[in-house]
Amino acid sequence: MLRSHAAGSLRPADAGQNVTLAGWVARRRDHGGVIFIDLRDASGVSQVVFREGAVLEAAHRLRAEFCVAVEGVVEVRPEGNENPEIPTGGIEVNATSLTVLGESAPLPFQLDDEAGEEARLKYRYLDLRREGPGKALRLRSKVNAAAREVLARHDFVEIETPTMTRSTPEGARDFLVPARLQPGSFYALPQSPQLFKQLLMVAGMERYYQIARCYRDEDFRADRQPEFTQLDMEMSFVDADDVIAVSEEILKALWALIGHDLPTPLPRITYAEAMRRFGTDKPDLRFGLELVECKEFFADTTFRVFQAPYVGAVVMPGGASQPRRTLDGWQEWAKQRGAKGLAYVLVGDDGTLGGPVAKNLTDAERDGLAAHVGANPGDCIFFAAGPPKSSRALLGAARIEIAKRLDMIDPDAWAFTWVVDWPLFEMAEDATAAGDVAVGSGAWTAVHHAFTAPQPQSEATFDTDPAGALADAYDIVCNGNEIGGGSIRIHRRDVQERVFAMMGIEHDEAQEKFGFLLDAFTFGAPPHGGIAFGWDRITALLARMDSIREVIAFPKSGGGADPLTGAPAPITPQQRRESGIDAKPKKDGE
């Protein structure tokens, strides 16, 4: 070893020891004939002092981020010179030898200053030397280890599934890899290990997991990555409660890493209730401000805007004091989300109603509105009217925005809930409008994916009543973030083929794309279910990071670009010819 001790491990009890440290020069300070450096390694920082002779002369050439090895004696710092902000603040190392292991060029940014994201990603190897980013990756390693420990106790088997497979419709576009030995044909990088883990259940593995790399060629969305990581699990001979129980044990172990005792079992809320009360399927439960249904209250209204399939409201406490410019800003805020605007009523200090909507209400409506929605004098009532899904989504977004503006969200709180009783299908046009890919050519598509089992009471009727069919599915939400989703799977060929048919995937197409799975179901497939956790998002939450990029070693920037390596990049004409990208695949029999 080139060092005897870690820089962050030294304490006053080590005084008098000869040590060898190795790391980077975090700071250098010249105090008139004495040079101090903060020497940083993965464990922390120690102060090193160069006082005289050749070692002092050598220290004059040190600059930030030089990689060095230092020999010296641990000394207790003089009284008054201690640094209580760091664990090693009571000692310093009096250097007797200095070796420069690697010089550093002038830095593109100072590591202890803020830097732009593009520069940080281009020089990610420098960015990771900083305490925050480096600490996040080390936490990620602990997260992996904690999950593996729980799963080992439950006899799970860690199995790697292929990362080059065939393209199958799973809800997003595939990344494609040309097959050189079969010109015109392509592998696909997996969007998830879904089909392989189900095949492993058919194979009798019973309990599988994998920390899996997944790939989705999606249009750019904020804080999405084209390649990401899941903790993927599957279990045979289980129901939803069994999968949820193991999942909660994992979550409890993960949050224990940051000193939080997660109480289990976690609460559950149905999808319908989440949409009704919070306007979203991933509700943030750290604060109140629930939506209020107003359709019946305005059943006889003459106000045409409120003669809609859905009318709802959310109250902004103290919002009546907002100036007109701020209220107009809410309209722009709503239009940015595809709405025409955000109707509002102001409740005066004396209880009278004001604003442009109030004059369109009857006396009875004005008299009873505040009580119906739970508004007090000085509050603002925001409304949405129209199709239920989009109107609730607008109010749900307004609820979050209100909470942010009023500082109602406790940043230290953790609020978990399972969302259960999901619809099995949604209209394909609704999925497309929401930015998702509607799998299949039918009018209906799967809300989760095509392999989700219907609940028992919906199994016989989902093809005649798709709107009312419920899925045996469950998502886990933390602080308004979906951090995992799973379901009991279909394990019978006839049920799977009926689901495909509902989605417009007819027999021949299903056999071509999923025949291997359908065939497997004919060989005694066990009931099974599982879940996949968004590992990047979970780690970001634990690290208190706003973006998943902060917990990924080498993330992509917006649009999937990699400033570090310059990927994606053009290929050479020779590579294009050899890969067979432009070749037409041979037809059967040719």
Swiss-Prot record:
The protein's Enzyme Commission number: 6.1.1.23
Pfam families on file: GAD, tRNA-synt_2, tRNA_anti-codon
Compositionally biased intervals (Basic and acidic residues): 575-590
Residues where L-aspartate binds: E170, R216, H448, R489
Compartment(s) where it occurs, according to its Swiss-Prot or TrEMBL record: Cytoplasm
GO biological process terms on file: aspartyl-tRNA aminoacylation
Residues holding ATP: R216, D217, E218, Q225, E482, G534, W535, D536, R537
Residue ranges the record marks as coiled coil: none
Catalytic activity reported: tRNA(Asx) + L-aspartate + ATP = L-aspartyl-tRNA(Asx) + AMP + diphosphate
SUPFAM superfamilies hit by this protein: Class II aaRS and biotin synthetases (SSF55681), GAD domain-like (SSF55261), Nucleic acid-binding proteins (SSF50249)
Site (Important for tRNA non-discrimination): H31, G80
Enzyme class: ligase
GO cellular component: cytoplasm
Source taxon at top rank: Bacteria
Region (Aspartate): 194-197
Record text on subunit structure and interactions: Homodimer.
Family: Belongs to the class-II aminoacyl-tRNA synthetase family. Type 1 subfamily.
Protein name: Aspartate--tRNA(Asp/Asn) ligase
Organism encoding this protein: Mycobacterium sp. (strain JLS)
